[in-house]
Amino acid sequence: MRRAEVQRTTLETMINVEFTMDGNGEFSGTSGLGFFDHMLTLFCKFGGFNLNLSCQGDLEVDDHHTVEDIGLVLGEAFSKALGDKKGIARFASGFYPMDEALMLIAVDISGRPYLAFEADFPPVLAGKFNYQMVEEFLRGFVQKAGITLHVREISGKNLHHKAEAIFKGLGRTLKVAVSVQGDELPSTKGVI
C-alpha cells in the first residue's frame, strides 16, 4: 500500500498528515480554515486519496503559514507514499470546468519541483482563507512532492469556482499520473 505519515513542527505550525495514495477519496481532520478544508476534500475525492490532517497554526496572524506548511507536509507525504515510482504513468493533464471557470492542469512526476501558475486570484477572503494562498499551497506541495505542475486559467470569474476547478483537477490529474501501468521506471535516464 502506498502510504506515508509526515509531521512538521515549527514556531508557527504543528502539522501531522497521514496520506494514502490508493484510498477511497476521504478527507478527515481540519486545517482550521473551512474553505481550505473544502478544497482538500475535493482534492482527495477526485484523486482517490485518503488524507487525515491534524493542524495547529498561527491563524491569529493570518492563513499563510498554515496553508503553505500544509502544502509542504502533504507534498512530502505524497513523495514518500509514491515510493520508487516504478511503473507509474508519470505524465497527465486535463481541462477541468466548474461552471464558467476552466483550468488546464498538467503534471510531470519528474523529481524536478517547478510550478507554473497562471491564474488570477486577488487578495480576497473566503471566510479566513485568502484566495492568494491557492498558489502558495501549490508551491509548497510541488517543492516537497518533487513534481512539475502547470496551472493555467482558461476562463473564469467566480473565485470559488476557479479554486474548485484547480483542486478537483489537481486530484484527478495526479490520480492518472500515479497510476501503475507497468513495472519499469518511466525515464530514459533511469532515475526520477
Curated annotation (Swiss-Prot):
CDD domains: IGPD. This is Imidazoleglycerol-phosphate dehydratase. It is an enzyme of class 4 (lyase). InterPro entries: IGPD_sf (IPR038494), ImidazoleglycerolP_deHydtase (IPR000807), ImidazoleglycerP_deHydtase_CS (IPR020565), Ribosomal_Su5_D2-typ_SF (IPR020568). Belongs to the imidazoleglycerol-phosphate dehydratase family. PANTHER family: IMIDAZOLEGLYCEROL-PHOSPHATE DEHYDRATASE (PTHR23133:SF2), IMIDAZOLEGLYCEROL-PHOSPHATE DEHYDRATASE HIS7 (PTHR23133). GO terms for molecular function: imidazoleglycerol-phosphate dehydratase activity. It catalyses: D-erythro-1-(imidazol-4-yl)glycerol 3-phosphate = 3-(imidazol-4-yl)-2-oxopropyl phosphate + H2O. Pathway: Amino-acid biosynthesis; L-histidine biosynthesis; L-histidine from 5-phospho-alpha-D-ribose 1-diphosphate: step 6/9. One of its GO terms (biological process) is L-histidine biosynthetic process. The keyword Cytoplasm applies. It is found in: Cytoplasm. One of its GO terms (cellular component) is cytoplasm. PROSITE patterns: IGP_DEHYDRATASE_1 (PS00954), IGP_DEHYDRATASE_2 (PS00955). It holds the Pfam family IGPD. The keyword Hydrolase does not apply. Its EC number is 4.2.1.19. Keywords: Amino-acid biosynthesis, Cytoplasm, Histidine biosynthesis, Lyase. The gene is hisB. Gene3D superfamilies: Imidazole glycerol phosphate dehydratase, domain 1 (3.30.230.40).
